[in-house]
Regions:
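Short, solvent-exposed amphipathic alpha-helical segments in soluble enzyme
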Residues: 5-9, 69-70, 85-86, 177-178, ...
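Residue-level "edge-of-site" marker
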Residues: 24, 156, 189
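Catalytic PLP-binding core of fold-type I/II PLP enzymes
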Residues: 1-33
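Short, well-ordered alpha-helical packing segments
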Residues: 4-11, 50-53, 136, 173, ...
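Glycine-rich beta-alpha junction loops
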Residues: 24, 58, 198-200
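Active-site C-terminal subdomain of aminotransferase-like
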Residues: 1, 19, 31-158, 162-167
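Short loop/turn segments at secondary-structure transitions that flank enzyme active sites
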Residues: 26, 75-77, 200
Length: 270
C-alpha cells in the first residue's frame, strides 16, 4: 500500500484533489482491522482524499464488467457527467462517457454484495491475507528460496511481489507458468507477483513447493552454464524473459508502445 496518509497531507498542503486507486484491495483493506491484521488509513477519514475507485468484480466477487467510484462531495461527482444540451435528438445526459450500461451487471453486483455480506468479506479477508502472509513467510524461511528470492516491500494485503538475487526472475515466471501458475511479471525492477485469491488459499502450499522446485531447476541450469563456460547471452528465453527483458533494456519506450499497439491490432483481425 502507498502511504495515503502522507499523500493526503501533501494534497491538502498543495490544495489538490487526491484520488485513491483502491480497485484491487477495496474489499480487503476495509476488512483488515476486523480480520485482525495490520492496516493503514486510506479512505475519506483522511481529509485530503477526494475520490476512491473500487472494483466490485475483483474481491467483491461480482460479475466482470462493473466497478464503482466514490466522491467526497456531489459537486466533485458532476465532473464525471457528460451532458450535451444541443443534440438534435434532445438533451443528452449520461453519468459517464461510457453511455448505456447493462442493468444485468448492476443486478449481479447487488446480488453478490447481498449474498456475501460484510461477514463473508471479513472471512474472505482472513483467508486471503492470512495465506499471503504464509507465502511471504515460506519465501523468507525456506532453505531453497530464502537465499535466492527477495520479497519486495512490505505486503499488507493480498499481493506478494518478489525478485531473484542471482537468477533471471522471468525464467522463474515462465517455469511456473509451465506448471500452471500464471504469475504476473513486473518491471523496474524485474520481479513477479502473486495476487492471492480464495482458490489459492486451498493450494498455497503446492504453489510454494512448485516454486522451490523451479528455483532449484533454474539454479542447476545456471550452474551447468557456468561449468560449460556459457553465459546468459544466447540461452533460450521463455515468453516473459523475452518480452520483459527486451522492454527493460530499451532506453526509448516508444518502441515498446509500438509493439503493444501492433499486438492490439492483431486482436481486431477477423
Amino acid at each position: 500500500m502507498d502511504d495515503i496518509n502522507a499523500l493526503s497531507r501533501l494534497a491538502l498542503r498543495k490544495k489538490l484533489p487526491l484520488h485513491v486507486d483502491c480497485c484491487l484491495g477495496s474489499f480487503l483493506v476495509p476488512c483488515l482491522e476486523k480480520a485482525g491484521f495490520e492496516t493503514q488509513p486510506f479512505d475519506f477519514r483522511l481529509k485530503g482524499v477526494t475520490s476512491i475507485s473500487c472494483d466490485t468484480h475483483k474481491y467483491g466477487f461480482a460479475p466482470k464488467g462493473n466497478s464503482t467510484v466514490l466522491y467526497r462531495t456531489a459537486e466533485l461527482r458532476q465532473y464525471q457527467y457528460y451532458v450535451c444540451p444541443d443534440w438534435s435528438g434532445g438533451v443528452y445526459a449520461s453519468p459517464g462517457i461510457a453511455g448505456s450500461r447493462p442493468g444485468a451487471l448492476i443486478a449481479g453486483c447487488w446480488a453478490s454484495l447481498m449474498t456475501v455480506g460484510e461477514s463473508g468479506y471479513v472471512d474472505a479477508c482472513v483467508k486471503i491475507v492470512g495465506t499471503a502472509k504464509k507465502i511471504v513467510d515460506a519465501i523468507q524461511t525456506s532453505g531453497s528460496l530464502s537465499g535466492e528470492l527477495q520479497i519486495m516491500g512490505k505486503p499488507l494485503v493480498s499481493v506478494v511481489a518478489f525478485t531473484a538475487l542471482n537468477l533471471n526472475i522471468y525464467d522463474i515466471a515462465d517455469a511456473m507458468s509451465a506448471k500452471g501458475w500464471h504469475l504476473n511479471a513486473l518491471q523496474d525492477p524485474p520481479a513477479i507477483h502473486v495476487a492471492v485469491t480464495l482458490p489459492i488459499t486451498r493450494v498455497w502450499d503446492r504453489l510454494v513447493k512448485d516454486l522451490e522446485t523451479v528455483v532449484e531447476e533454474e539454479r542447476e541450469k545456471e550452474r551447468v552454464r557456468q561449468v560449460e563456460g556459457k553465459g546468459a547471452k544466447g540461452k533460450a528465453m521463455g515468453n516473459s524473459a523475452a518480452l520483459y527483458g527486451v522492454a527493460g533494456s530499451l532506453p526509448n519506450k516508444s518502441v515498446v508502445v509500438d509493439l503493444a499497439n501492433g499486438f492490439l491490432d492483431i486482436l481486431y483481425k477477423a
